[in-house]
């Protein structure tokens, strides 16, 4: 757990100016909220924070925040990054108690190759994460969905999942997690018959071709396509 400790300093100044000066020092503004307490405004080292969540749990890593000589258990709940440099600019922490369940989003992954895929179907995930409740120390790394027996046209719903011990899924039981779709058939264009040299035009082709003898060219015809004379050109 030593690698999951974040040292923080309380900050009194708020706003864009103080935040900018803080980033110039290599720190970022942060806030801790939760447990029906007023938010606490902090500053933390972004490099230390990113290193601390380099675990299989990623953003659901349980962190220990050291502040004013005390320790808080927190989760890294939200963040902001610079749109150009992609550097971390702000962090939000949720304070938790080790004996109280917390609601988090956990990644969903599939395991196995479905029967439907072997038959040419396309496996799709309707969602890439599910929300569940668990104790902070019992949050799973991921939820695995076995799709081995899934046939074309079939789907797996939340009711068919077995959550890890101590976890409760917070989704409707009929919510679709994964399904195997019927492959789309490619439409093949019908071949066009080649024109036979010297053959008479099809009925109506003459009407669509050159104008009748003595008739004026239609608007937009060859006469209309001639480039206009340049301004000042000799006539």
Swiss-Prot record:
Keyword set, alphabetical order: Ribonucleoprotein, Ribosomal protein, RNA-binding, rRNA-binding
Family: Belongs to the bacterial ribosomal protein bL25 family. CTC subfamily.
Record function comment: This is one of the proteins that binds to the 5S RNA in the ribosome where it forms part of the central protuberance.
NCBIfam families xrefs: bL25_bact_ctc, PRK05618.1-2, PRK05618.3-3
HAMAP family the UniProt entry points to: Ribosomal_bL25_CTC (MF_01334)
Subunit relationships: Part of the 50S ribosomal subunit; part of the 5S rRNA/L5/L18/L25 subcomplex. Contacts the 5S rRNA. Binds to the 5S rRNA independently of L5 and L18.
Low complexity biased stretches: 210-222
Region annotation Disordered: where it falls in the sequence: 1-21, 210-235
Bias (Basic and acidic residues) ranges: 223-235
GO cellular component: cytosolic large ribosomal subunit
Alphabetical GO biological process terms: translation
Keyword Transcription regulation included in the entry's annotation: no
GO molecular function: 5S rRNA binding; structural constituent of ribosome
Protein biosynthesis as UniProt keyword: no
Protein name as catalogued: Large ribosomal subunit protein bL25
